[in-house]
């Protein structure tokens, strides 16, 4: 069986602006604009300022301009996006925290930073009605303060030092004990609010990928604006961590599993599991932010867990896995380990030397040096530049492709 594991690099290779910064730059433009009457993608991405700021958007606009001009937005979608942007605390935090070219893994790290800071601050202020900032790192205070939980600051001099005491908004406190009139910080309510806001932010991403990416690309394929794309023509199964349907547009007959959800359905946006999740009594305060929790709740991994893995484990034939456009970051360690373990041969496609170095570094982080050496010896692990990847459309061509790799 021939498998492919896809990441966001696949969409980027098609000229689609699907990186985190592409999404955020577009959201920034919409919010800053005085108008919400844009009719098409072209009306927004034609902005010289936006195209100068973001090369992915500029290149996509040049490549798919005719499509972007021809497809109207659904009624009211830009107004709905703008309304959510104005209120969403995650968008406000992220757009105010940095302005650099980052990817999805970096966004997961931002979520992790927020979880770490809230965990530290909330646990240290348990049973208190307010937060004493003097005992916390500046980073933790900055993050908590960014989410609008805190009210006025009172400066109190104590032992020749100044303490900064911040009250917490009343709706995020609870009376304990009941009837006492004494209110303390309601940790559960704060965490629930953070998660609800993250899901609202996720809905923005859904809308972006739907109207700015999926719909125009499907039309571009329909109008044959995309050249012949046969790299994975003889693939039997695809496991993608992308939300888009670009692969299905190019290969409609191939079965695709969207492990992290897909446009038009629930999508997963969170942080990876860690060793603490395997403790006998793990802390579950922030479990809803974990990707494995969301996969279980939203059922995005059902086909993968209960159909594909069982099929692979019981397969009598050779299993060949190709990886394209996925960084192999430790954040997806559980998926990578499972797929690598059931595969007989693994080919990782890379587009440049720095990407190759990143893949090797990440694999060492996941498997360790000895584990990586063992993979190379027992799993026939190879790295192949995309420039040498043949466009195979038959089983024989694919076997020839892997035979050539074995000689390199």
List each language-model region with its residue ranges:
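Extended, H/D-rich, highly charged conserved domains that either
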Residues: 40-301
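Intrinsic-disorder/low-complexity, polar/charged segments
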Residues: 19, 270-274, 352
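SIR2/sirtuin-family catalytic core signature
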Residues: 1-14, 20-26, 30, 35-52, ...
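A general structural motif
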Residues: 296-307, 326-330
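Short boundary motifs at domain starts and secondary-structure transition points
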Residues: 225-232, 307-315
């Amino acid at each position: 069986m021939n498998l492919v594991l896809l990441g966001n690099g696949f969409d980027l290779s098609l000229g689609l602006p699907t990186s985190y910064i592409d999404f955020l730059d577009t959201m920034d433009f919409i919010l800053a604009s005085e108008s919400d009457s844009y009719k098409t993608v072209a009306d927004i991405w034609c902005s010289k300022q936006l195209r100068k700021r973001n090369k992915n958007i500029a290149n996509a606009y040049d490549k798919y301009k005719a499509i972007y001009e021809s497809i109207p937005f659904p009624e009211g979608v830009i107004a709905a996006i703008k309304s959510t942007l104005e209120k969403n605390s995650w968008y406000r935090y992220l757009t105010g925290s940095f302005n650099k070219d980052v990817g999805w893994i970096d966004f997961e790290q931002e979520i992790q930073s927020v979880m770490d800071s809230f965990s530290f601050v909330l646990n240290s202020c348990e049973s208190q009605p307010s937060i004493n900032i003097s005992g916390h790192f500046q980073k933790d205070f900055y993050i908590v303060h960014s989410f609008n939980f805190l009210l006025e600051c009172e400066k109190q001099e104590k032992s020749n030092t100044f303490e900064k005491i911040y009250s917490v908004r009343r709706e995020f406190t609870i009376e304990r004990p009941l009837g006492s009139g004494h209110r303390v910080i309601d940790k559960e309510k704060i965490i629930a609010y953070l998660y609800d806001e993250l899901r609202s932010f996720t809905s923005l991403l859904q809308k972006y990928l739907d109207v700015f990416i999926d719909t125009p690309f499907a039309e571009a394929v329909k109008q044959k604006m995309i050249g012949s794309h046969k790299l994975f023509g003889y693939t039997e199964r695809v496991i993608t961590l992308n939300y888009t349907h670009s692969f299905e547009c190019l290969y409609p007959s191939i079965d695709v599993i969207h492990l992290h959800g897909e446009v038009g359905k629930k999508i997963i946006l969170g942080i990876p599991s860690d060793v603490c999740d395997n403790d006998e009594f793990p802390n579950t305060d922030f479990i809803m932010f974990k990707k494995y929790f969301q996969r279980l709740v939203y059922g995005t991994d059902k086909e993968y867990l209960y159909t594909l893995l069982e099929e692979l484990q019981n397969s009598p034939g050779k299993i060949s896995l190709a990886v394209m456009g996925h960084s192999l970051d430790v954040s997806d360690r559980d998926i990578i380990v499972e797929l690598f373990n059931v595969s007989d041969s693994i080919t990782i496609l890379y587009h440049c030397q720095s990407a190759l170095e990143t893949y090797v570094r990440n694999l060492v982080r996941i498997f360790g040096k000895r584990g990586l050496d063992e993979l190379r010896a027992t799993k026939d692990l190879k790295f192949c530049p995309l420039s040498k990847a043949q466009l195979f459309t038959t089983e024989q061509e694919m076997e020839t492709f892997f035979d050539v790799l074995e000689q390199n």
